[in-house]
């Protein structure tokens, strides 16, 4: 496929992903192990960390470590995280390393053979990466299943609670939330309606679990999240007191653009409290059966 290399007897003055799958797997495993393969240390942990560290912070969206690109959905697909590193080759080859799930993906192919008009860009890379990302499970926060948005592009999925009458000044929504979306392009929105037609954003806070002290709640005044939750469940609370004395519906709306997606969004352990009363609990079978899902599915992983 490389006419210049052919004319020079096989010599090519450029770099790319050139080797067999096994050699690349050894390289990937070594880097994910922090520089160790088997019983041999090849690189120091400090050196490996530099490969996964963004040194291009002045240019958001163009994250780059030493030698590797970082967080690039255009070929990493749903494997992309702020710590995911990768490299591509001209003919559609790619190597993606995701330390957050301890997984790697090698794609070897020749999309310009026998003719360059066959070139398919990064679509095979993204499709394969999405499948691998989906194969890594996200376990429910509670119980056997959680609501999953799916990973479809150019779509809108809604998860709607039944209409609930709220009479307390301390009414609130509580749930567990997990998200991984293409930053800014895709998002998860919490919305409310008193008539089932005009929906407005519901501000909320999230708390990421951590060792030791309880972290401060992170406000989401626009009632939405995008990007990466750190591959952990967050506790969400939303103040619903503004709808006191009204019948209220709540819904989650997950939207994606036409190009790339992340691992998706999960919602679990949904509860609506009206003061001292729990007026909705997704763990109660009767309440669970009243949830309206379009595009969302109950998933064990």
How does the language model describe each region?
Residues 78-83, 91-94, 100-101, 109-301:
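Beta-sandwich/jellyroll recognition modules and their flexible linkers
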Residues 29, 67, 174:
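Cytochrome P450 C-terminal heme-thiolate binding region
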Residues 53-63, 183-184, 258-260:
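Secretory-pathway/luminal and periplasmic proteins that interact with or process carbohydrate-rich
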Residues 1-61:
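Penicillin-binding protein/beta-lactamase superfamily catalytic region
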Residues 17, 23-24, 31, 57-58, ...:
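Solvent-exposed loop/turn segments at secondary-structure junctions
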Residues 1-2, 55-98:
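Short, Gly/Ser/Thr-enriched beta-strand-loop segments that form substrate-interacting elements
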